[in-house]
């Protein structure tokens, strides 16, 4: 994968997503996710956390099923990086005004035209909200701790205070426990309940 210099390919994240979605063992999920996070560059970590959780960092970019249903001719080889996909989604979400629907579809077509068939399936799942990862927030929190070699309690505390697992993951992998300790209460920022981070839904037993 991309390593410390980043440049993680979307295909690599899509494959980790597939492994996590088809793996029943909690520890195997955690290790697969942690491995992906270790390979991501500093700016890619929050994107990887979001994608592997089945979410878009941008939340909504104005792309519905109508823009995806006709399909796109896939690329033969994977070249798209996480950063390129994230930038593409941001550009799509920024389109507004007269002719925005056509412009947005053109950008979607351009992005999907660079994706392989497997990557396209992953992107459709991501955009439609139908991506089923098995990477619940509690599992991802533990994966961040594993990847950064820090106690999971430190990650949970930081997320409670910061409110963003992606931002906390980037800090943890870059600066370890010292970076996590720097997170504190901020005026106007709500504190997340720790129970959400421990297990947001029913998990399979650890094996």
Question: For the regions a protein language model found, what residue spans apply to each?
Answer:
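N-terminal nucleic-acid-engaging modules of covalent nucleotidyltransferase systems
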Residues: 1-207
